[in-house]
């Protein structure tokens, strides 16, 4: 479980561990963000959000590698581009939760999770 914190060029994660880790990390960081937000610790909310997305991107890269995907940098840069576009759109919409920026981010976030949850394991490298 701890290897999801360390980016590697050859780390892989199985489907079952990916689903469990994704759900667990999202719940833990959701509670942390809510707790820090209620205590008005804005810096800790930002740090928790950055660590959450770092872990999710790292887990997704490991799951992509387990599925046989070899262009990991394409995924990372594409995800960062979606994050930046979402943030710019949210700023333009005055951070409205029902705006397009939030929807772009959520669609990307959960469609990636769904795709990787259903992705087969690469059988050619077993």
Swiss-Prot record:
Cellular component terms per the entry's GO annotation: plasma membrane
Residues in the Cytoplasmic compartment per record: 1-18, 62-67, 122-126
Membrane in keyword set: yes
Subcellular location: Cell inner membrane
Topology of the protein relative to the lipid bilayer: Multi-pass membrane protein
Positions on the Periplasmic side per record topology: 40, 89-100
UniProt name for this protein: Inner membrane protein YigG
Biological source species: Escherichia coli (strain K12)
Lineage: Bacteria, Pseudomonadati, Pseudomonadota, Gammaproteobacteria, Enterobacterales
Top-level lineage group: Bacteria
Transmembrane residue ranges: 19-39, 41-61, 68-88, 101-121
Keyword Flavoprotein tagged: no
Keywords: Cell inner membrane, Cell membrane, Membrane, Transmembrane, Transmembrane helix
């Amino acid at each position: 479980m701890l290897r999801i914190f360390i980016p590697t060029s050859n780390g892989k994660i199985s489907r079952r561990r990916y689903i469990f880790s994704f759900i667990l990390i999202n719940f833990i960081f959701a509670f942390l963000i809510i707790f820090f937000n209620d205590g008005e610790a804005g810096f800790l909310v930002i740090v928790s959000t950055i660590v959450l997305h770092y872990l999710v991107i790292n887990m997704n890269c490991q799951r992509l590698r387990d599925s046989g995907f070899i262009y990991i940098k394409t995924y990372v840069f594409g995800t960062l581009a979606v994050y930046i576009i979402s943030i710019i759109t949210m700023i333009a919409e005055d951070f409205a939760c029902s705006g397009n920026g939030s929807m772009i981010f959520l669609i990307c976030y959960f469609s990636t999770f769904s795709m990787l949850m259903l992705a087969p394991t690469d059988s050619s490298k077993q």
